[in-house]
């Protein structure tokens, strides 16, 4: 990519700087007669990293209310940059920490041949992520399912998330 390039972004959303070299990937998008659906993609890259997602509607009030943020490009950034599922989960957290998340909420699952992770993201800069244990099956419905991250051997959450949850009841 030429120096100073940005990843393609929808109008009004964060234009994420492109990295110099990207990985090849397969991309599948659900489409309607009107065209593709922005957040209905599945990516699988040349290093064997797959990312899928499902919407998670917020149960209380909306998040930060700040304009912009990242949406579609989270999947693409993982496809272009992640060399493992573990790398992918850190890329996701770094991008949300830096740019914020535009939609109301989403669950992403990233996996490779060795590991799988789920991250659930709310609007703004709020998320919780867990490594899926090797002897477990992951179910990704249209709502938040990580209620006790400490029940997992490996988990991460955004700064201030626990305090905000207590404050909101």
What are these model-predicted stretches?
Residues 1-71, 91-169:
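A contiguous strand-loop segment
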Residues 63-64, 74-82:
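Second-shell loop/turn segments in exported
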